[in-house]
């Protein structure tokens, strides 16, 4: 099956480039579109009451770092990146919204094979939310 628009969900870890390479290798033979998305935790939702942190400054800095990392992934993809998206909130809902808006038909995401990922897997959440084809790529941390 030839996909028309592949969405790569990245967490901006060093392993994200593995996902980009995998998606590009699938897109190239069919001249499919490729887009990147990163979904950030909305830190203001994690805190209740008063805190001694300037969330506005912290979120601005995180947004700048995210933009820089996405730009670097896009530039080094070796293939045209159609959309570079960044969102915050519920991972599944943000992806569903992007899929509908940009008519995407495949989501490529990674799954870190570590202790914490066994407890709280983003991939498992997406399987129950996203209604297009998915490719889940097992990732190993670079130290291993």
Curated annotation (Swiss-Prot):
Matches recorded under Pfam families: Usp
Induction of its expression: During growth inhibition caused by the exhaustion of any of a variety of nutrients (carbon, nitrogen, phosphate, sulfate, required amino acid) or by the presence of a variety of toxic agents. Positively regulated by guanosine 3',5'-bisphosphate (ppGpp) and by a RecA/FtsK-dependent regulatory pathway. Negatively regulated by FadR. Also regulated by CspC and CspE.
GO terms, molecular function: identical protein binding; protein homodimerization activity
Alphabetic keyword roster: Cytoplasm, Phosphoprotein
PTM comment: Phosphorylated on serine or threonine in response to stasis.
Subcellular localization, as worded in the UniProt entry: Cytoplasm
Transmembrane segments: none
One GO process term, biological-process aspect: response to stress
Signal peptide: none
UniProt xrefs under InterPro entries: Rossmann-like_a/b/a_fold, Universal_stress_UspA, UspA
Origin superkingdom: Bacteria
GO cellular component: cytoplasm; membrane
S-adenosyl-L-methionine is among the record's keywords: no
NCBIfam families tied to this protein: PRK15118.1
Subunit structure: Homodimer.
Similarity remark: Belongs to the universal stress protein A family.
Protein function: Required for resistance to DNA-damaging agents.
Name the UniProt record assigns to this protein: Universal stress protein A
Organism of this sequence: Escherichia coli (strain K12)
